[in-house]
Protein backbone atom coordinates (compact mmCIF):
# COMPACT_ATOMS: atom_id res chain seq x y z
CA UNK A 1 0.00 0.00 0.00
CA UNK A 2 0.90 3.67 -0.18
CA UNK A 3 3.07 3.71 2.93
CA UNK A 4 6.17 5.65 3.81
CA UNK A 5 8.55 2.68 3.47
CA UNK A 6 8.00 2.37 -0.28
CA UNK A 7 9.95 4.05 -3.03
CA UNK A 8 8.35 3.58 -6.43
CA UNK A 9 11.42 3.55 -8.67
CA UNK A 10 13.28 1.03 -6.52
CA UNK A 11 10.30 -1.29 -6.69
CA UNK A 12 9.43 -1.08 -10.36
CA UNK A 13 13.01 -1.70 -11.48
CA UNK A 14 13.06 -5.06 -9.69
CA UNK A 15 9.65 -6.63 -10.21
CA UNK A 16 7.54 -8.00 -13.06
CA UNK A 17 4.10 -7.87 -11.44
CA UNK A 18 2.47 -5.53 -8.94
CA UNK A 19 -0.04 -6.99 -6.47
CA UNK A 20 -1.50 -5.98 -3.15
CA UNK A 21 -3.92 -7.04 -0.40
CA UNK A 22 -6.99 -4.82 -0.02
CA UNK A 23 -8.71 -4.80 3.38
CA UNK A 24 -10.62 -1.52 3.81
CA UNK A 25 -12.47 -0.89 7.08
CA UNK A 26 -15.87 -0.72 5.43
CA UNK A 27 -18.78 0.79 7.40
CA UNK A 28 -16.46 2.53 9.88
CA UNK A 29 -16.60 5.87 8.08
CA UNK A 30 -18.92 7.06 5.35
CA UNK A 31 -18.73 4.58 2.47
CA UNK A 32 -17.52 7.21 0.01
CA UNK A 33 -14.57 8.02 2.30
CA UNK A 34 -13.47 4.39 2.51
CA UNK A 35 -14.08 3.88 -1.20
CA UNK A 36 -11.95 6.91 -2.05
CA UNK A 37 -9.05 5.57 0.02
CA UNK A 38 -9.31 2.16 -1.68
CA UNK A 39 -9.41 3.82 -5.11
CA UNK A 40 -6.29 5.83 -4.29
CA UNK A 41 -4.42 2.68 -3.27
CA UNK A 42 -5.51 0.91 -6.47
CA UNK A 43 -4.35 3.80 -8.64
CA UNK A 44 -1.02 3.88 -6.82
CA UNK A 45 -0.47 0.19 -7.59
CA UNK A 46 -1.44 0.68 -11.23
CA UNK A 47 0.89 3.67 -11.49
CA UNK A 48 3.95 1.72 -10.33
CA UNK A 49 4.39 0.07 -13.72
CA UNK A 50 1.69 1.90 -15.71
CA UNK A 51 -0.08 -1.38 -16.39
CA UNK A 52 -2.68 -3.64 -14.70
CA UNK A 53 -1.92 -4.99 -11.24
CA UNK A 54 -3.31 -8.00 -9.37
CA UNK A 55 -5.64 -7.76 -6.40
CA UNK A 56 -4.03 -10.66 -4.57
CA UNK A 57 -6.19 -10.69 -1.44
CA UNK A 58 -9.59 -9.38 -0.46
CA UNK A 59 -12.03 -10.63 2.14
CA UNK A 60 -15.41 -11.99 1.02
CA UNK A 61 -17.02 -11.02 4.33
CA UNK A 62 -15.18 -9.81 7.48
CA UNK A 63 -11.62 -10.13 8.73
CA UNK A 64 -10.69 -11.27 12.24
CA UNK A 65 -7.71 -8.98 12.83
CA UNK A 66 -9.22 -5.51 12.49
CA UNK A 67 -10.41 -3.80 15.68
CA UNK A 68 -14.02 -4.64 14.79
CA UNK A 69 -14.93 -7.55 12.49
CA UNK A 70 -17.68 -5.83 10.54
CA UNK A 71 -19.55 -7.86 7.94
CA UNK A 72 -19.64 -6.50 4.41
CA UNK A 73 -23.17 -5.33 3.74
CA UNK A 74 -25.08 -7.06 0.89
CA UNK A 75 -23.75 -6.02 -2.50
CA UNK A 76 -20.54 -4.47 -1.21
CA UNK A 77 -18.31 -7.40 -2.17
CA UNK A 78 -19.32 -7.02 -5.81
CA UNK A 79 -19.01 -3.22 -5.70
CA UNK A 80 -15.55 -3.31 -4.09
CA UNK A 81 -14.35 -5.97 -6.53
CA UNK A 82 -15.55 -4.05 -9.57
CA UNK A 83 -13.93 -0.91 -8.16
CA UNK A 84 -10.57 -2.69 -8.17
CA UNK A 85 -11.07 -3.72 -11.80
CA UNK A 86 -12.15 -0.20 -12.75
CA UNK A 87 -8.89 1.14 -11.33
CA UNK A 88 -6.68 -1.32 -13.17
CA UNK A 89 -6.78 -4.72 -11.48
CA UNK A 90 -6.69 -7.83 -13.66
CA UNK A 91 -7.87 -10.07 -10.83
CA UNK A 92 -10.12 -10.35 -7.79
CA UNK A 93 -8.73 -12.98 -5.42
CA UNK A 94 -9.85 -13.92 -1.94
CA UNK A 95 -8.37 -14.79 1.38
CA UNK A 96 -9.49 -17.31 2.21
CA UNK A 97 -11.31 -20.03 0.28
CA UNK A 98 -12.15 -22.22 3.28
CA UNK A 99 -12.07 -21.33 6.97
CA UNK A 100 -9.62 -23.38 9.00
CA UNK A 101 -10.83 -25.12 12.15
CA UNK A 102 -7.99 -23.81 14.28
CA UNK A 103 -5.11 -21.37 14.67
CA UNK A 104 -5.14 -17.60 14.40
CA UNK A 105 -7.29 -17.23 11.28
CA UNK A 106 -10.08 -19.66 12.06
CA UNK A 107 -12.58 -16.79 12.27
CA UNK A 108 -11.28 -14.88 9.26
CA UNK A 109 -13.87 -14.54 6.52
CA UNK A 110 -13.87 -17.10 3.72
CA UNK A 111 -15.79 -18.17 0.64
CA UNK A 112 -16.66 -21.46 2.40
CA UNK A 113 -17.29 -21.19 6.14
CA UNK A 114 -17.35 -23.86 8.85
CA UNK A 115 -20.87 -24.83 7.81
CA UNK A 116 -19.40 -25.95 4.48
CA UNK A 117 -22.44 -25.45 2.27
CA UNK A 118 -23.05 -23.40 -0.85
CA UNK A 119 -26.39 -22.04 0.37
CA UNK A 120 -24.93 -19.06 2.22
CA UNK A 121 -25.15 -15.34 1.53
CA UNK A 122 -21.39 -15.04 1.16
CA UNK A 123 -21.08 -17.94 -1.29
CA UNK A 124 -23.94 -16.50 -3.33
CA UNK A 125 -22.32 -13.05 -3.46
CA UNK A 126 -18.96 -14.53 -4.46
CA UNK A 127 -20.73 -16.39 -7.27
CA UNK A 128 -22.49 -13.23 -8.45
CA UNK A 129 -19.21 -11.33 -8.38
CA UNK A 130 -17.53 -14.04 -10.43
CA UNK A 131 -20.30 -13.90 -13.02
CA UNK A 132 -19.90 -10.13 -13.30
CA UNK A 133 -16.16 -10.54 -13.80
CA UNK A 134 -16.74 -13.11 -16.54
CA UNK A 135 -18.84 -10.55 -18.38
CA UNK A 136 -15.88 -8.15 -18.19
CA UNK A 137 -13.24 -10.65 -19.31
CA UNK A 138 -12.57 -8.76 -22.53
CA UNK A 139 -11.09 -5.77 -20.68
CA UNK A 140 -8.36 -7.84 -19.01
CA UNK A 141 -4.96 -6.40 -19.83
CA UNK A 142 -6.29 -3.00 -20.80
CA UNK A 143 -4.47 0.09 -19.60
CA UNK A 144 -5.72 3.34 -18.09
CA UNK A 145 -4.86 6.68 -19.65
CA UNK A 146 -4.61 9.52 -17.15
CA UNK A 147 -4.53 13.23 -17.96
CA UNK A 148 -3.72 14.20 -14.37
CA UNK A 149 -0.93 13.13 -12.04
CA UNK A 150 0.04 13.61 -8.40
CA UNK A 151 3.69 13.75 -7.38
CA UNK A 152 4.00 11.41 -4.41
CA UNK A 153 7.69 10.97 -3.76
CA UNK A 154 8.65 8.70 -0.88
CA UNK A 155 12.08 10.24 -0.30
CA UNK A 156 10.44 13.64 0.08
CA UNK A 157 7.92 12.18 2.51
CA UNK A 158 10.59 10.42 4.56
CA UNK A 159 12.57 13.63 4.91
CA UNK A 160 9.52 15.76 5.68
CA UNK A 161 8.15 13.44 8.35
CA UNK A 162 11.57 13.11 10.00
CA UNK A 163 12.14 16.87 10.14
CA UNK A 164 11.78 18.71 13.44
CA UNK A 165 9.00 21.19 12.72
CA UNK A 166 7.00 22.96 11.61
CA UNK A 167 4.19 20.79 13.02
CA UNK A 168 5.38 17.84 15.08
CA UNK A 169 1.85 16.90 16.09
CA UNK A 170 0.97 15.90 12.55
CA UNK A 171 1.70 17.18 9.06
CA UNK A 172 -1.40 15.44 7.65
CA UNK A 173 0.43 14.78 4.41
CA UNK A 174 -1.76 11.88 3.27
CA UNK A 175 -4.91 13.85 4.05
CA UNK A 176 -3.60 16.56 1.73
CA UNK A 177 -2.91 14.00 -1.00
CA UNK A 178 -6.39 12.53 -0.56
CA UNK A 179 -8.02 15.95 -0.90
CA UNK A 180 -6.27 16.51 -4.22
CA UNK A 181 -7.05 12.99 -5.42
CA UNK A 182 -10.66 13.19 -4.26
CA UNK A 183 -11.23 16.47 -6.07
CA UNK A 184 -9.98 14.99 -9.33
CA UNK A 185 -12.00 11.80 -8.96
CA UNK A 186 -15.19 13.75 -8.30
CA UNK A 187 -14.62 15.34 -11.70
CA UNK A 188 -14.21 11.90 -13.26
CA UNK A 189 -10.51 12.46 -13.96
CA UNK A 190 -8.16 9.46 -13.98
CA UNK A 191 -5.04 9.98 -11.87
CA UNK A 192 -1.50 8.59 -12.01
CA UNK A 193 0.95 8.77 -9.11
CA UNK A 194 4.52 9.76 -9.97
CA UNK A 195 7.80 10.19 -8.19
CA UNK A 196 10.34 12.84 -9.14
CA UNK A 197 12.39 10.50 -11.31
CA UNK A 198 9.56 10.17 -13.81
CA UNK A 199 8.65 12.38 -16.74
CA UNK A 200 5.77 14.84 -16.49
CA UNK A 201 5.12 14.81 -20.23
CA UNK A 202 1.78 13.54 -21.47
CA UNK A 203 -0.25 15.01 -18.61
CA UNK A 204 -2.42 18.11 -18.80
CA UNK A 205 -2.19 18.91 -15.09
CA UNK A 206 0.17 17.78 -12.32
CA UNK A 207 -0.21 18.36 -8.58
CA UNK A 208 2.59 18.48 -6.01
CA UNK A 209 1.13 18.40 -2.49
CA UNK A 210 3.79 19.23 0.11
CA UNK A 211 6.75 18.36 -2.13
CA UNK A 212 9.19 19.24 0.65
CA UNK A 213 12.32 17.78 -0.95
CA UNK A 214 13.47 18.50 -4.50
CA UNK A 215 15.60 15.93 -6.32
CA UNK A 216 16.12 14.31 -9.72
CA UNK A 217 16.05 17.67 -11.48
CA UNK A 218 12.39 18.22 -10.67
CA UNK A 219 12.75 22.01 -10.93
CA UNK A 220 13.69 21.77 -14.61
CA UNK A 221 10.98 19.20 -15.27
CA UNK A 222 8.35 21.49 -13.80
CA UNK A 223 9.69 24.49 -15.70
CA UNK A 224 9.62 22.61 -19.02
CA UNK A 225 6.19 21.13 -18.30
CA UNK A 226 4.70 24.59 -17.75
CA UNK A 227 6.53 26.03 -20.77
CA UNK A 228 4.96 23.29 -22.90
CA UNK A 229 1.47 24.33 -21.79
CA UNK A 230 0.91 22.10 -18.78
CA UNK A 231 -0.74 23.26 -15.57
CA UNK A 232 1.25 22.63 -12.39
CA UNK A 233 -0.29 23.05 -8.93
CA UNK A 234 2.01 23.17 -5.91
CA UNK A 235 1.05 23.56 -2.26
CA UNK A 236 2.77 25.03 0.79
CA UNK A 237 5.93 23.43 2.24
CA UNK A 238 7.42 22.59 -1.15
CA UNK A 239 10.93 23.00 -2.50
CA UNK A 240 12.42 23.49 0.96
CA UNK A 241 15.40 21.07 0.97
CA UNK A 242 17.66 19.21 -1.46
CA UNK A 243 18.13 15.45 -1.77
CA UNK A 244 20.43 15.48 1.27
CA UNK A 245 17.77 17.22 3.38
CA UNK A 246 19.81 20.43 3.39
CA UNK A 247 17.82 23.64 3.28
CA UNK A 248 17.99 25.62 0.06
CA UNK A 249 19.37 29.15 0.30
CA UNK A 250 17.87 32.09 -1.56
CA UNK A 251 14.17 31.40 -1.13
CA UNK A 252 11.54 28.76 -1.77
CA UNK A 253 10.14 27.05 -3.74
CA UNK A 254 13.73 26.57 -4.86
CA UNK A 255 14.42 27.27 -8.51
CA UNK A 256 10.76 27.96 -9.26
CA UNK A 257 10.00 31.32 -7.70
CA UNK A 258 9.87 32.92 -11.14
CA UNK A 259 7.67 30.12 -12.49
CA UNK A 260 5.08 30.58 -9.74
CA UNK A 261 5.59 34.32 -9.43
CA UNK A 262 6.05 34.26 -5.67
CA UNK A 263 8.35 33.52 -2.78
CA UNK A 264 7.35 31.77 0.43
CA UNK A 265 8.42 34.01 3.31
CA UNK A 266 7.07 32.22 6.40
CA UNK A 267 5.01 29.15 7.26
CA UNK A 268 2.64 29.38 10.22
CA UNK A 269 1.65 26.09 11.87
CA UNK A 270 -1.77 25.98 13.51
CA UNK A 271 -2.91 24.07 16.59
CA UNK A 272 -5.69 21.54 16.07
CA UNK A 273 -8.24 23.97 17.45
CA UNK A 274 -7.02 26.86 15.27
CA UNK A 275 -9.09 27.76 12.22
CA UNK A 276 -8.33 30.45 9.67
CA UNK A 277 -10.26 31.26 6.52
CA UNK A 278 -9.49 32.10 2.92
CA UNK A 279 -11.74 34.52 1.07
CA UNK A 280 -11.86 34.97 -2.68
CA UNK A 281 -14.11 34.89 -5.73
CA UNK A 282 -17.17 35.25 -3.53
CA UNK A 283 -16.47 32.19 -1.38
CA UNK A 284 -14.94 31.45 2.01
CA UNK A 285 -12.82 28.37 2.70
CA UNK A 286 -11.76 26.88 6.04
CA UNK A 287 -8.00 26.64 6.61
CA UNK A 288 -6.33 24.32 9.12
CA UNK A 289 -2.81 23.07 9.94
CA UNK A 290 -0.73 25.53 7.87
CA UNK A 291 -0.79 29.06 6.50
CA UNK A 292 1.97 29.80 3.99
CA UNK A 293 2.85 33.48 3.80
CA UNK A 294 4.02 34.46 0.34
CA UNK A 295 5.32 37.54 -1.41
CA UNK A 296 3.96 37.78 -4.93
CA UNK A 297 5.95 38.87 -7.95
CA UNK A 298 3.71 38.52 -10.97
CA UNK A 299 1.27 35.93 -9.65
CA UNK A 300 -2.47 36.64 -9.68
CA UNK A 301 -4.04 36.58 -6.22
CA UNK A 302 -7.13 34.38 -5.99
CA UNK A 303 -7.60 33.98 -2.24
CA UNK A 304 -6.70 36.08 0.79
CA UNK A 305 -6.36 34.99 4.41
CA UNK A 306 -9.07 36.40 6.65
CA UNK A 307 -6.73 36.61 9.65
CA UNK A 308 -4.81 39.89 9.78
CA UNK A 309 -1.69 38.00 10.87
CA UNK A 310 -1.58 36.06 7.63
CA UNK A 311 -1.11 38.91 5.22
CA UNK A 312 -0.26 37.09 1.99
CA UNK A 313 -2.31 35.05 -0.45
CA UNK A 314 -2.48 31.76 -2.35
CA UNK A 315 -1.94 32.59 -6.00
CA UNK A 316 -2.15 31.58 -9.63
CA UNK A 317 0.63 32.33 -12.12
Regions found by a protein language model. Name each.
Residues 6, 12-66, 80, 113, ...:
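Glycoside hydrolase catalytic-domain groove-lining segments
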Residues 2-11, 309-317:
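Single conserved hydrophobic/aromatic residue that forms the stacking wall/gate
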Amino acid sequence: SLRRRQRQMCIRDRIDVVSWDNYPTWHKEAEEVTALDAALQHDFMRSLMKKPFLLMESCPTSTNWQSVSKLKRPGLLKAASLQAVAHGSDSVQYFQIRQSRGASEKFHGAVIDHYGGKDTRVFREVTETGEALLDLAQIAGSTTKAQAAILHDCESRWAMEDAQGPRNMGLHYMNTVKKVYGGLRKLGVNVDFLDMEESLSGYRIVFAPMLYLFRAGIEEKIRNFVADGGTFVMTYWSGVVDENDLCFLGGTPHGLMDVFGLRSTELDALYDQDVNAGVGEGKTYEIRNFCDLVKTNGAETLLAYLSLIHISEPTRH
